[in-house]
């Protein structure tokens, strides 16, 4: 077995199949498992997906939200066990794969049309 096939076989077992399909422009609720000392809790991070990158086990996505007037972006590995679950709140209609232009927009200008 070649190295490439071996790596593919190992990573295939690590991929998660319980995640919903989502695209840039969608609004997600990401339930993240946070461990503080001996305690474990779930924190919900809700925002708009501004990018997805990579493939296979190394795929990541970035979610952006506005928290008390400050833009917060958080990048998550897609197949990490730290993500409890992902809920798609809204499906957004955008014509770009990377929504970096949302960083400069404020208020109503930063809205994304919803797919009906």
Swiss-Prot record:
GO BP terms, alphabetized: translation
Pfam families: Ribosomal_L19
Gene Ontology MF: a single term: structural constituent of ribosome
Domain of life: Bacteria
Matches recorded under InterPro entries: Ribosomal_bL19, Ribosomal_bL19_CS, Ribosomal_bL19_sf, Translation_prot_SH3-like_sf
Record keywords: Ribonucleoprotein, Ribosomal protein
An annotated GO cellular component: cytosolic large ribosomal subunit
SUPFAM superfamilies documented for this protein: Translation proteins SH3-like domain (SSF50104)
Stated role: This protein is located at the 30S-50S ribosomal subunit interface and may play a role in the structure and function of the aminoacyl-tRNA binding site.
Family: Belongs to the bacterial ribosomal protein bL19 family.
Name recorded for this polypeptide: Large ribosomal subunit protein bL19
């Amino acid at each position: 077995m070649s190295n490439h096939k071996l790596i593919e076989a190992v990573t295939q077992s690590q991929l998660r199949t319980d995640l919903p399909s989502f695209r840039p422009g969608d609004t997600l609720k990401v339930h993240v498992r946070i461990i503080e000392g001996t305690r474990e809790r779930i924190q919900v991070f809700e925002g708009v997906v501004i990018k997805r990158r990579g493939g296979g086990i190394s795929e990541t996505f970035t979610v952006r939200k506005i928290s008390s007037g400050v833009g917060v972006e958080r990048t998550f590995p897609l197949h990490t066990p730290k993500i409890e679950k992902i809920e798609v709140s809204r499906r957004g209609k955008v014509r770009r794969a990377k929504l970096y232009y949302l960083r400069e927009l404020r208020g109503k200008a930063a809205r994304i049309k919803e797919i009906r």
